[in-house]
Amino acid sequence: FMRF
């Protein structure tokens, strides 16, 4: 989520 935050990494994508």
From Swiss-Prot:
Protein known as: FMRFamide
Gene Ontology biological-process entries: neuropeptide signaling pathway
UniProt family annotation: Belongs to the FARP (FMRFamide related peptide) family.
Cellular component, GO, one term: extracellular region
Main location: secreted
Compartments, as annotated in UniProt: Secreted
Highest taxon listed in the record's lineage: Eukaryota
Function text: Myoactive; cardioexcitatory substance. Pharmacological activities include augmentation, induction, and regularization of cardiac contraction.
Originating species: Macrocallista nimbosa
Keyword ATP-binding: no
UniProt modified residues of type Phenylalanine amide: 4
Keyword hit for Secreted: yes
Keyword terms: Amidation, Neuropeptide, Secreted
Disulfide partners: none
